[in-house]
Amino acid sequence: MSNNKIIESLAILYLNNYINDNDIYSLSLINREFHINIIKDDYFYSTINKNYLFLYIKIFKLLSIKVKLNPNWINIINNNNNINNNNNNNNNNNNNNNNNNNNKIKLIKNNFSVISERLNFLIQCKFNLHRYLDNNDLFITILRGEKLSTLDRIICFSIIYSQDQILLFLLNFILSNINCNNNNNNNNNNNNNNNNNNISNISNSNRLLANNSYNIQFNQQIPTQNELINLNKCLQFSTSTTTTTTTTMVPPFNENILKVYPIYFAIVKVIGGGSLVRFLLSILPNVYNITNVNCKLPITNRSALFYSTTREMTLLLLQLGCNIHDMDYKGMLPIHYHSLNGHVDVVKCLIDDSTINALDQSNNTPLNLASLSGNLSLAKILLNSGARLSIDNLNGRYPIHNACVNGNIDLIRYFLELYSKMNSTTLLPSTTTTTTTTTTTMTTTTTTAITTTTATTIQNNSNNLTNSNSSSVGGLRISNGGNTQQQSIQIPDKENNTPIDLLVLNNHFTIAIELLKYEGYIVGKEEFNFKTARKIGAGAFGDVYLVEWRNKNVAVKRVKIEKILESGKSYQWIRDKFILEAVLMVKLSNFSSFVKLYATCIEEKELLLVLEFCDNGSLYTILNTIPIGGAGANNNNNNNNNNDIIQSLPSINTLSLNIANGMNYLHSLKPQIIHRDLTSQNILIDRNGIAKIADFGISRFKNDIGDKTMTSIGNPRFRSPEVTKGQKYSEKVDVFGFGMILYEMFTRRVPFHDYEQIAASFKIANAERPPLPQTIDHRWSNLIQICWDQNPNNRPSFDQILTIIQNLPIANIPKFLVPLQQNQNQIQNQNQNQNQNNGKLDLSTSSSSITNLNNAVTAKLSLSTSGGLFSGDSDYTVGTCSGYDIGYDNDGDIIDYSSDQNDSDLYD
């Protein structure tokens, strides 16, 4: 015999009280396999639960059968009571009759005790009924935590699990109690006639479907009303002693204790639901009146129409008087609910002019919700019926946004086709040039936006593409592609997430390529000739080339696919990580604090990023190509160009503001973007001296769970101590890197320049910091020290840093190496900040706002998603080469690819 059979046998013995809990426990200790099956796998208790359910059904059947076999129990019991009351007076005269009655009573009581015993057992194990219901998804969805009586629960159970016999038994029992209660209020002589007339009226006048199967079963298979009344009184009698002088009265049964939930489960039933609904309405019209406002679910306020899942049921409910404009607790109409759940046939029945573009409390239309469910056929039906694409919800999301959350590629392609027709079949609205400049947020360079002044429509779709005058849209922008009439769908929502951002945030990478194509960012590899291109940067898994493309110089980042495949990664993994970085660069391309992405190539054997070429190279190159010595040292020709660049650069204030402004924007996004490799190698300087943040190859967004642990990525010299220690990290790792960049700009040295990189990272992890020159103003020193504080919680945010820098004195990058000598006060101040981990920067002198920033520094950003190319779960990075100046090989050593004397000051 298998273990499962043995366990089932034990369960039966347990149910019949042959063994108890101690026996089961002892057996589990003796036999390890029993321990696994009984305790660990819970098979024993699940078997008991299953047997309880079968027993539940069996007892109900037994009750019904017993009542049928003993229809005159109540008369015999009452006679027995009368005999007991008059026993002393009539003992001699009725001795023989009394003996006969006593025998009958004894037999009846024996039979009744069996029923009573099983009923008590049924009540004791009713928690198993609750367990079955509470684990049922449909029951949980409709109930929403509402408390139900056991009677309501049994009715719901009978409907959900199609236990028709139990359901009919219960309904007859309910009717018997209701009419029994009515009889107590009427004349006893007319009680039975009135009762029968009432039931006849309920069954005939209000019955919606005659001779259906439920009514036939109801009348034929279940005990009569008198039998049920007798059963009820017998149950009550069992609680009395045999010497009771009068039979205990049955407590009045009030139908108001019943709730509306059972009929909702009948409505949801796909097979036989219509007949069951009609039956319930005919039997208990006062309880299950679906047109009554009290019939709405108490918590969700949803009417019966919300839970219809078929066309037939929907038409039945509409015929019965259900209102299509009934709102639930979220302000949703039934059409909203069914659009969200993809019930196409139901939505067809609910569409009219008043519902097609109706808004719920979140300003979602049925089309918004259908797009979120990714139902293409439903979206087409709604659009052909007059639904509009141009209505956004309170989160600023249009149907295209929700479609990208779902990731249905066919639906997204359909929307893209509609957007393209918007401009190819109609006149474009007039355009206005707008420029926005603020003091605390970054502003875009002057861009052209389409401002809608009148509604435009597509003739083929019945006004379904009417542009909205909502200010949240700001007009749909022209796409980046070659077709200037192509309508861009890079529309940010209230959290600055565009449709393509939502795709990558929900891991729909393949579909993201479709949107990149639509926006004109995808190009073919045949446009680039790497044989004639000059390599200007390299790393372990990627190279950067200077290429002439479409009549301009660009930097092309080329991923070494074969090299990465050798490390064990799949092409899909490589491509997905690459798309993350490309999408991030697309969003940052309009803003001066970030390197612009012109195009990308995503093919099986080629992954390319076509980037803006920054003439002055990286900040690292500028700071580290210097003459060795102090002021007045002889400058050779190798450094003349570099000195010219340094002299032409803006102050450290402006450069640091530019960097901090961009990082502040990244950290303010939802989800938050963490660069994770903020070093001077990844800060590029264009010909105008504007600092641009580059290389988002290992950036990542912070999810809702919280801080993440991070593998040792990036340059060890700029790596925060929590990263080196493998601890949880936050956006404060970028603040640490920013502090190291400030140190490098003031000293023209990398942190711990006289140590190997790994040794430098260990010194940082041990709370050591490179010495600060005494020539640095103490206010700048304080900022650097608080940024690289050992405790991440003590580091300021970039928003605070922006305010601080506005109040610092002007400082410039020195022409030569600065002696690293410190006075005693600076050492003590630094030790206090690093070792006590309680340093707090004094912001009392900071101004309340930042004003009159350089236009190159204040650029308004519109990024909403992260990069993440070869992110923290990988053991390598392409990152350091995308600054296309120098890279790090596998050992982290600097690789010099300079071959042209004139370019040595630009790309090392």
From Swiss-Prot:
Catalytic activity annotation: L-seryl-[protein] + ATP = O-phospho-L-seryl-[protein] + ADP + H(+); L-threonyl-[protein] + ATP = O-phospho-L-threonyl-[protein] + ADP + H(+)
Biased composition (Polar residues): 480-490
Span list, region Disordered: 461-491
A GO CC annotation given for this chain: cytoplasm
Database matches in SUPFAM superfamilies: Ankyrin repeat, Protein kinase-like (PK-like)
Ranges for the ANK repeats: 258-289, 300-326, 330-361, 362-391, 395-424, 495-524
Transmembrane spans: 154-174
Side Extracellular, residues: 1-153
Record-annotated active site: D677 (proton acceptor)
Residues on Cytoplasmic side: 175-908
GO terms (BP aspect): signal transduction
Keywords: ANK repeat, ATP-binding, Kinase, Membrane, Nucleotide-binding, Repeat, Serine/threonine-protein kinase, Transferase, Transmembrane, Transmembrane helix
Domain Protein kinase: 530-817
Family per similarity comment: Belongs to the protein kinase superfamily. TKL Ser/Thr protein kinase family.
Protein name: Probable serine/threonine-protein kinase DDB_G0278521
Organism listed in the record: Dictyostelium discoideum (Social amoeba)
